[in-house]
Curated annotation (Swiss-Prot):
Pfam families: Methyltransf_9 (PF08003). Keywords: Transferase, tRNA processing. It comes from Geobacter metallireducens (strain ATCC 53774 / DSM 7210 / GS-15). Catalyzes carboxymethyl transfer from carboxy-S-adenosyl-L-methionine (Cx-SAM) to 5-hydroxyuridine (ho5U) to form 5-carboxymethoxyuridine (cmo5U) at position 34 in tRNAs. Carboxy-S-adenosyl-L-methionine binds at residues 91, 105, 110, 130, 180-181, 196, 200, 315. SUPFAM superfamilies: S-adenosyl-L-methionine-dependent methyltransferases (SSF53335). Coiled coil: none annotated. NCBIfam families: PRK15068.1 (NF011650), tRNA 5-methoxyuridine(34)/uridine 5-oxyacetic acid(34) synthase CmoB (TIGR00452). It comes from the Bacteria. HAMAP family: tRNA_carboxymethyltr_CmoB. Belongs to the class I-like SAM-binding methyltransferase superfamily. CmoB family. Transmembrane segments: none annotated. This is tRNA U34 carboxymethyltransferase. It catalyses: carboxy-S-adenosyl-L-methionine + 5-hydroxyuridine(34) in tRNA = 5-carboxymethoxyuridine(34) in tRNA + S-adenosyl-L-homocysteine + H(+).
Length: 323
């Protein structure tokens, strides 16, 4: 397994030789097989995908790999079955040799909301925390990022990334199966750090903000997306139990409260650049994600509330700078 051979020199060139050495052990085939009992099945599914060569690649406005004309002797139905083996597809959409992977989330909508407000990514080294299957990382590369490292603890998402890498073969975009807690403290080597859909899952959100800050070089930019609630600086909602059927939701601050958190953590140039109510057009079940989705999490009689009676999901995007 040579997925990460190109990763280690990039990290070493960023002054992270020791981290690169640690990851060579953590990401070795033997270690991954030991950590993940279902890894052999995923590897078999990956190897069963056809060898195809895309006639075109587009990452700027979409994530498009090849066209239907590239399939040659491979049938469209066989490729669909191969891709469906990696269900559920949550982040996207992707177009793969003419097959439209209609994912649960229209992640391209979030990208369009944030892109006009962040520092240009051209030439930047980016860390994407909780990156899922790497969809936004591909969009970052399309926007000119020099190097993108995604960290994602869920193996199915990492394997979906490897599906795309099978055809894109990009040595400057990697998704590795670790969490933020596995990143060495204060590497201070990334120009941009993204954390989207992570903060509300952390028992200690301020510690998470400090971890993100430690990953940035001085002058680097944090792009933070999270669930919020309406209210003033003292408004922070902690669900007494589940939130939208999720067990692991801890703190939902107001815009003003999260601004204060970022200030107390030492960030400057803090701005909330977008706040958008999540709709069932942006997050929904599809043939590529056949489990429950947003419509099942909301009060059927009041779309402004979750089924538990809490405020329905409202997501904000913040930018902030490490001085």
């Amino acid at each position: 397994m040579s997925w990460y051979d190109a990763l280690f020199p990039h990290l070493a060139a960023m002054g992270q030789e020791r981290w690169a050495e640690q990851l060579q052990v953590t990401l070795s085939e033997s270690q991954l097989l030991q950590r993940y009992g279902d890894m052999p099945g995923w590897l078999s599914a990956l190897q069963a995908l056809p060898e195809l060569h895309p006639s075109r690649i587009a990452l700027q406005d979409t994530v498009t790999i090849g066209s239907g004309a590239d399939l040659c002797s491979v049938t469209r139905e066989d490729l669909i079955l191969g891709l469906q083996a990696f269900h559920p597809w949550r982040k996207g959409p992707y177009s793969v040799f003419g097959i439209e992977i209609d994912t649960e989330w229209r992640s391209d909508w979030k990208w369009e909301r944030l892109l006009p407000h962040i520092q240009p990514l051209a030439g930047r080294k980016v860390l994407d925390v909780g990156c899922g299957n790497g969809y936004h990382g591909w969009r970052m590369r399309g926007a000119g990022a020099d190097f993108v490292l995604g960290i994602e603890p869920f193996l199915v998402s990492v394997m979906q990334f490897q599906v795309m890498q099978r055809y894109l073969r990009d040595p400057r975009h990697h998704v590795i199966p670790i969490g933020i807690e596995d990143v060495p403290p204060n590497p201070a080597c990334f120009d941009s750090v993204f954390s989207m859909g992570v903060l509300y899952h952390r028992r200690s959100p301020l510690d998470h903000l400090l971890e993100l800050k430690g990953c940035l070089r001085p002058g680097g930019e944090l792009i933070l997306e999270t669930l919020i609630v309406e209210g003033g600086q003292e408004t922070i909602f902690m669900p007494p139990g589940r939130y939208a059927k999720m067990r692991n939701v801890w703190f939902l601050p107001s815009i003003a409260a999260l601004t204060l958190w970022l200030q107390r953590c030492g960030f400057t140039e803090i701005a909330c650049v977008d706040a958008t109510r999540t709709t069932c057009e942006e997050q929904r079940a599809t043939e590529w994600m056949r489990f429950e989705s947003l419509a099942d999490f909301l009060d059927p009689d009041d779309g402004g509330k979750t089924m538990e009676g809490h405020p329905a999901p409202l997501r904000a995007i913040f930018t902030a700078t490490k001085p």
